[in-house]
C-alpha cells in the first residue's frame, strides 16, 4: 500500500513540473532565419545572444569601412580621367602650331618633342640649355679630333681641369674655337679687309647691342675714303700681329727670334 502511495505522489510531481516548465531558445547557436517569423523583431533581438549582436555590429562596420575606399578610388579615377581630358585638349590646341613648326624647321620641332620627355630639361632648364650649347660645338671638336688627335686630347684634358670649363663650358669651347679661327682670320684680313670685317660679325659686341651703330661703322670702314684712315690701318695691322702677341706671351725668348712682319709700322 505504501508503495502505491509513493508512486502516485511521483506521478503528481512530474505532472506539476511539466505544466510549469518553459523552453529557452538557444539563439546563440542558431541563425536569425530559424527564429519564427511570427515573433516581432524586438522580441527576436531580445532573445539573441550578446556575441551575436556584437558580430552583427562588426559586420555592419566592416561593410561601411569597405565602402569608403571604393568611393574614394572612384573619385580619384574620375579626377584622373578629367586631368587626362584637359591634357588631351591642350595638346590638340598646340598640334597645329607644332605641325607648322615641323614644316618650317624640323630640327626645332624635334627639339620641342625631346624637351617634354627629357628629365634634365624638366629638372634644370639651365643645365639643359648648357647641354644644348655644348652639342653645337661637338662637330668642331670632332673635326679637330680627325685632323689633330693630339690637340683634341689636350683640349679634353684641359676641359676637366680648367676652372673656366667647370664654371662655363660653352664660353671655354667658344674661346678655343676662336683661337683656332684667328690664323685664318689674320690671312683673310691681309687679303681682303672688307671680308674680314664681315667675318667678325658674330663676335662683335657692338653688333649684338646696337645693330644700327654697327652698320654705320661698317659703312664707314668699307667706304673707299675711310680705308686710307690711319686708325683703320693700325687696327688691321694689330689684328695681323695678334698671333705673334700671344706667342710672345707664352715664350718671350723665342718671340725675339721670329721675323718681324709688321715692319711697315716702324
Swiss-Prot record:
One Pfam entry name: Zein
Signal sequence region: 1-21
Keywords on record: Seed storage protein, Signal, Storage protein
Keyword Signal belongs to the record: yes
InterPro entries documented for this protein: Seed_Storage_Prolamin, Zein
MF term (GO), any: nutrient reservoir activity
The protein's role, per its UniProt record: Zeins are major seed storage proteins.
Additional facts recorded: The alpha zeins of 19 kDa and 22 kDa account for 70% of the total zein fraction. They are encoded by a large multigene family.
PANTHER family documented for this protein: ALPHA KAFIRIN
Family designation: Belongs to the zein family.
Protein name listed in UniProt: 22 kDa alpha-zein 8
Protein's organism: Zea mays (Maize)
Taxonomic lineage of the native organism: Eukaryota, Viridiplantae, Streptophyta, Embryophyta, Tracheophyta
Amino acid at each position: 500500500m505504501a508503495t502505491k502511495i509513493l508512486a502516485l505522489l511521483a506521478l503528481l510531481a512530474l505532472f506539476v513540473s511539466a505544466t510549469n516548465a518553459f523552453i529557452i531558445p538557444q539563439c546563440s547557436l542558431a541563425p536569425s532565419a530559424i527564429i519564427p517569423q511570427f515573433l516581432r523583431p524586438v522580441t527576436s533581438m531580445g532573445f539573441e545572444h550578446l556575441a551575436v549582436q556584437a558580430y552583427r555590429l562588426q559586420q555592419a562596420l566592416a561593410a561601411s569601412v569597405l565602402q569608403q575606399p571604393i568611393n574614394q578610388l572612384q573619385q580619384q579615377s574620375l579626377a584622373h580621367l578629367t586631368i587626362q581630358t584637359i591634357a588631351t585638349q591642350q595638346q590638340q590646341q598646340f598640334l597645329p602650331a607644332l605641325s607648322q613648326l615641323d614644316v618650317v624647321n624640323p630640327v626645332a620641332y624635334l627639339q620641342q618633342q625631346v624637351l617634354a620627355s627629357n628629365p634634365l630639361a624638366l629638372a634644370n632648364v639651365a643645365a639643359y640649355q648648357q647641354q644644348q650649347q655644348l652639342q653645337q660645338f661637338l662637330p668642331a671638336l670632332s673635326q679637330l679630333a680627325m685632323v689633330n688627335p693630339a690637340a683634341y686630347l689636350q683640349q679634353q684634358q684641359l676641359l676637366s681641369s680648367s676652372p673656366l670649363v667647370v664654371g662655363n663650358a660653352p664660353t671655354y669651347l667658344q674661346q678655343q674655337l676662336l683661337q683656332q679661327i684667328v690664323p685664318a682670320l689674320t690671312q683673310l684680313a691681309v687679303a681682303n679687309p672688307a671680308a674680314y670685317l664681315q667675318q667678325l660679325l658674330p663676335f662683335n659686341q657692338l653688333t649684338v647691342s646696337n645693330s644700327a651703330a654697327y652698320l654705320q661703322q661698317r659703312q664707314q670702314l668699307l667706304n673707299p675714303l675711310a680705308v686710307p684712315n690711319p686708325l683703320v690701318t693700325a687696327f688691321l695691322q694689330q689684328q695681323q700681329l695678334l698671333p705673334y702677341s700671344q706667342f710672345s706671351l707664352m715664350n718671350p725668348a723665342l718671340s725675339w727670334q721670329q721675323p718681324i712682319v709688321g715692319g711697315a709700322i716702324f
